[in-house]
From Swiss-Prot:
It is an enzyme of class 6 (ligase). Heterotrimer of A, B and C subunits. HAMAP family: GatA. Keywords: ATP-binding, Ligase, Nucleotide-binding, Protein biosynthesis. It comes from Janthinobacterium sp. (strain Marseille). InterPro entries: Amidase (IPR000120), Amidase_CS (IPR020556), Amidase_dom (IPR023631), AS_sf (IPR036928), GatA (IPR004412). The active site is at residues 74, 149, 173. This is Glutamyl-tRNA(Gln) amidotransferase subunit A.
Amino acid sequence: MHTKTLKELSALLHSKQISATELAQLFLDRIAQSDLNAFLHVDPALTLKEAALADQRLASGDTTVLTGIPIAHKDIFVTRDWRSTAGSKMLENYVSPFDATVVEQFKQAGMVHLGKLNCDEFAMGSSNENSYFGAVKNPWDKAAIPGGSSGGSAAAIAARLTPASTATDTGGSIRQPAALCGVTGIKPTYGSVSRFGMIAFASSLDQGGPIAKTAEDCGLLLNAMTGFDPRDSTSIERDKEDFTRDLNQPLQGLKIGLPREYFGAGLAADVEQAVRAALKEYEKLGATLVDISLPKTELSIPTYYVIAPAEASSNLSRFDGVRYGYRAKDYTDLSDMYRKTRAEGFGEEVKRRILVGAYVLSHGYYDAYYLQAQKIRRLIAQDFQQAFTQCDVIMGPVCPTVAWDLGDKADDPIANYLADIFTLSTSLAGLPGMSIPCGFGQGEKNSKRPVGLQIIGNYFAEAKLLNVAHQYQQATDWHLRQPAE
């Protein structure tokens, strides 16, 4: 049962072959037996209460395709009645008085909430080792990282602890863990999914999206997640669309752009081999490969690591111990309380980024760093628009290597940042991008570690990306592979 797709589970629920309560209990049992640290907060009583409501809806016929199906939320989305920690000591015991819009949308669809998923603190990280509550283990090899910041979301899908999960992507945090855990994830166009109730890291980059087993599953989840929200000032007003409408379109005549910058030095041989094999499969499906250039790719890391920390330093200034969250125990005056609360409440990586952000926004450095980074960001977006005059979608690796061992890069933040080289540009441009499993590379002691293929589209081309991914998944079985229990 735990290996079935959302469509298969929906058919079983609607034909009364299984109840929402039975399905929820099945996944709760799997979560209880897991040692991956993917979940931060599980409350079986709350889950089973929601499952009972879903069963009532199924009995009355007031349903959607998602009614009764379990889902778990990245602990960046606030949830009423559940702790919302953002993986930080600062919010260790925080319970939100309201649900994030995304959580609300899935409740309205009748989905059943299984629990909150582990992530890097305030979504800052590429390995899920920055969580105050401990690292998440990769289900394919427990010595390896799952990727970040949505490591819990990807690991939980790979280990079949939930059939659906929410995640967020600021610079690659949906695509990279999906790739390293061998599952499917999509970051939609910036502004497509409401950020209301999504704990902010970098507001001009943060975007919610789903992680699941298949492209079709992601499309069904995206149908519920997207839509205009007046409570989010960056939400885009567009008609609702069915992202699964074009899944079965043939790929004959599709032009796939291959950026030469994505296949150069630094790309591991086993990753390149898996990606090239996937591209050959696309040629068999009728697609044509086109050589393109994204010349500003190498500037994406310095650009991102100026803009994102600048926005984070502003967003995280609200966590000061006054209104909610952690407060230092011993202090002499208000300034001392601010200082100690933030020093004790934030982890090392978060403090590092706040310092960088405050520096690049400070008098005398704003023009030299922040303003320059925004100019480069615009040029990166222009590179993509130029590329899309030559091709329909862009493909390449998600990450230069397979998942590395836990602790390998823990003391080297720059090495972690470099792992995002292929995902940052898409985020800076606000484009949709996804990762699908396309093979395995070599880990330590000959372990198999997944490789992801990145597919990037033009603005609002999610249906096209899902079609391109689905056709590949119909021809291959990488997305069906799962780690040993």
